[in-house]
Amino acid sequence: MKSQKTLIKMFSTAAVAAMSVSSLFAQTNLGADCGCPPVASRPTVLLTTLAGAEGQLLAKNTILTCDKTWILDDKIYVDSLKSLTIQPGTVIKGRKAATGNANALIVQRDAKIFASGTPTCPIVFTAEADNLDGTFPTASTGQWGGVVILGKSFVNLTVAKNTTSGSTTRYCAGIDGTGFIEGFSAANRRNVYGGGANVDEDDNSGILKYVSIRHAGDVLPVIPGTPADGSNELNGLSLGAVGRGTTIEHVEIISAADDNIEFFGGTVNVKYITTMFGADDMFDFDLGYKGKAQFYFGVKTATNDTTTTISSDNGIEADADDDKAAPVHALRSHPIFYNCTFVGNNRYNGNADNSGPAGLQAKELTEGEFYNNIFANFRTGVNFATARDNATNLGDGYDNWTSADNAYNTGTGVAVKGSLIIKNNTFFGNRYPITKGAMTTGKWSAIVTNPADGVKLSLGSADDMTQFTNDGNLVPTTIAGFNTVWAMNSTTNAVSTVLDVIPSSNLASTITAPADGFFTPAAYRGAFDATKPSWLSGWAYATVLKTSAGLQSNPTDINQDGMTDMKDFNQLLTRFNKANN
């Protein structure tokens, strides 16, 4: 039942004090549990003072301590065979660069980042102007570049099929299985990712745990001095061919100017991820990504937000590859998702880049497996791409999904039946459960003005809906305790109606994630278990803004170890009567 996630109205004095400490202390006085001084008292240090002329950190093992605020004032590289360690409670602030440029942290191939925060001592990357009290506008995206990690796992770029063409920046780096990461000049070989002939799917780029990345991302020109065209973008977190030896858990990406998180190939697995208020997709994968994801919570701007910066893009944007000719099945993206909750705002922005507000946008021969997820408040639950760029190699995401007995089965060419699986998901508050077609701005405009238009963008057929339903997907009209219509001012961050994405009781599923060492078996739909405290503890940005009901863990569990005991009481005593800022 949901009672464990609802704050009890009456507490003892000690419990109330513990609640205040648990939720506020970790946010406005980051790192206090770890002995870090108040953020306002920390002197600032430019990261360029630790770097060489090309932005490379000079020490073999650089350590950023929490007694200073570190300013990311350029592109800073962790070179191959070097490491960067960031202590719990540390704050790194990105400085906004001149137009056409962006300051970012780049971890190269064979380098490592060790950023292991804790629930009460998270590590925060944010904008230089953010004073960390929750008042910096969530509408302020793109204030710095973001975090980029480059690995030696798999990426399906090839010299023959992925050379420089027009304005695209997703092209091979001269060796099959390598590429230049988006957002940077291709002339710089330090921006290469992928293992080439020596792919290591278990490649280890380090650790990101209890890390918050805020107000990052940018859309940059391919050629300096020319207008940006949307093909060269930095995300909040960009992962280029990162291997499954890398640990990425309890990470949140807030107010990114492009995608919150994007996977360019790779095999890295991610767990307990939060994305909020991004300007593009919540989760974007391409170029042969084959990782796993579980317990992912994503939300767009509020449903009442009418500002010009309103985001309307996808929950998941799924691509198999960027080779439109005849990609080999074994080289396509094929991730596996369990227990995610994606909440859109049910709005349409005709000016948005690649505007396509779908819970799951299945493009470019999309493959993958999607189980036990909730997609809410999108224009369409799933959109299947049906048109290929190359007419001699037909088949696309729709044809990978449709069963052989579907009367609308049109798959030919390189489609692989059953390679896209969508089972036991819940679709709530979406205008349409299934659509088919290329979701360009024009096509969306047509369907918005004429919902019966079956030419511009087709609604799912009767056979489609039969398969959709037989696969255990549900389209309920109500979910008890689940409220995705909420109100927030993205300039002042004032929340007038809270979001609640945890149902009163679990939405049952007949499918359970396998106990394979990564997945946690969970026979319910969505990112949160209604019978347990939320995994979004007091450190998360949602609790700072108080956007969401039910996302605060047990308030008396100060150290967030799942139990209220003497350890929590002792921590309370050490903090009692101390200021929270």
In which residue ranges do the predicted regions lie?
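Alpha-helical segments with a strong preference for the paired helices of cellulosomal dockerin domains
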Residues: 558-581
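Short, recurring structural edge motifs at helix starts
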Residues: 73, 327, 554-562
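Sec/Tat signal peptide C-region and signal peptidase I cleavage site
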Residues: 9, 22-26
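Amphipathic alpha-helical repeat elements characteristic of tetratricopeptide repeat
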Residues: 552-553, 566
